[in-house]
Each structure stands twice: as C-alpha cells, then as structure tokens.
Amino acid sequence: MRDRISDFLEEKHGLSANSKQSYKYDLEQCLDIVGERISDTSLKIYQAQLANLKISAQKRKISGCNQFLYFLYHKGEMDSFDRLESAKQAEKKAEKPEILDLDSFWQGSDFPEGRLLALLILEMGLLPSEILALKVADINLDFQVLRIQKASQQRIVTIPTSLLSELEPLMGQTYLFERTGKAYSRQWAFRQLEAFVKEKGFPALSAQALREQFILRQIENKVDLYEIAKKSGLKTVLTLEKYR
C-alpha cells in the first residue's frame, strides 16, 4: 500500500511540491495506523485518532485518505470503497456528554478481555495504549497502585478496590494483556472492546467515550480538575474545562 502513494500523487496534476509532501505525510500517517490490510475496523481506529484535531485538520486528512482509498479501489486493489466519515458528520454526532448507567459492565460477559479493558478505562481513565503496554511488574495490588510509563515520564495511578479481584488472576503474566508473553495490538484491543460494548447494548461507545465517562464521574464526585488531569495523564486542564 505504501508504495502506491507515489503513484497516487503522480495522478494529481497541478499540485505544488509542498502540497504533495503534505499529502504524502498524511497518507503515511494514516497507513501507520490502518496498516497494510485496510478494513472498516482499522479505519475506525484511524478516525478516532483524528478526533482531537481541529476540524480543518480533520477535513484535510480525511479528504486525502478517502481520495487515496478511492484510487486503490479504482485500481482494483480493494474489493469495496471503504471510506472515512466526514468531519462534519462526526461533528453533528457530538452531543453534550452525560453520565451513562454502565452498571452492566460489572456483570459477566462472553468477551472478558473487552470487559476488563472497558473497566480499566471507565474506572481509571487509562488509554488503551497505556493498558496494552502495562506489565504485571508495574502493578502492586497490595498498595493498590500501578505505574504508567511513557518515554522518560511515569505516573502512579490508584487502583479502585473494585478492580483488585479482576486483576489478581492475571498477576502471573508478563503483560496484563498478552499472548505467549507478547502484548496484543491496538486493533485486537479495539475489536475486543467493540464486541463487549455491543454485547452490553452500547454499540457507539468508544474508548474515548469511556474515558470521557471517567472524567464525568470524577467531576460528579467533586474531584479537582488538576487531580483529574493528573490521573488521566493530561498535561493541562484545558481539555477538561468544557465538562465544568
């Protein structure tokens, strides 16, 4: 797929060198996340990654990616023309967030990994990438804390008592979520989470929306915004101001 970017750009006449470079950067970034096997699931993952960008940036990246996807479809390299949702459509879907009744998440499930992923996001505000990178060695159930490491930075997060029994059976592994000692991919996590929330009747509930539920619950409990930012790994409280 990546080697087809140059062919795609050659067919776009009248573009300046800077515009072509911008297209190339956006498409390479898209393929870094989507991978070589483009699917509806991988496109949803990429769409979620764009959600925090300005609408203008989203429109540019979505337009470029959709043009490239159509190019691949037109050349017979894709069976169907799968595309990203327009930024306007995504914006229209945005409504004022409210606290959802997610008590059913604590009940049994045919998707136990998806269930635990959802609970870790909902109860602790962790990102899926942080959860997948989490090693058992970074979890201390006795002190009810876990350590999140990102590059040279780390933060200590308190584990709610309600999650201790969920984590205890996994303490003999290397990673919290693993297969033969290797951490699972983001696409695996996305599929597990998607299957679980569908099972519970919340098909539109993404990892980002679950993290938002964590924030809303913290605010409901009168937790200071700076403390919420610290728990969530946010550098500032600016993104939390809208929830006041």
Swiss-Prot record:
Keywords for this protein: Cytoplasm, DNA integration, DNA recombination, DNA-binding
GO MF annotations in UniProt: DNA binding; tyrosine-based site-specific recombinase activity
Residues covered by the Tyr recombinase domain: 90-244
Record Pfam families: Phage_integrase
Any one cellular-component term (Gene Ontology): cytoplasm
Any Gene Ontology biological process: DNA transposition
Residues making up the signal peptide according to the UniProt record: none
Domain Core-binding (CB): 1-73
Coarse class of the protein's main subcellular location: cytoplasm
InterPro entries with a match to the protein in the record: CB (IPR044068), DNA_brk_join_enz (IPR011010), Integrase-like_cat_sf (IPR013762), Integrase_catalytic (IPR002104), Integrase_recombinase_N (IPR010998), Tyrosine_recombinase_XerD-like (IPR020876)
Cell location: Cytoplasm
Active site: K150, R211, Y243
Keyword DNA-binding applies: yes
Keyword Acetylation in record: no
Similarity comment: family membership: Belongs to the 'phage' integrase family. XerD-like subfamily.
UniProt function note: Putative tyrosine recombinase. Not involved in the cutting and rejoining of the recombining DNA molecules on dif(SL) site.
Family annotation (HAMAP family): Recomb_XerD_like
Identification of the protein by name: Tyrosine recombinase XerD-like
Name of the coding gene: xerD
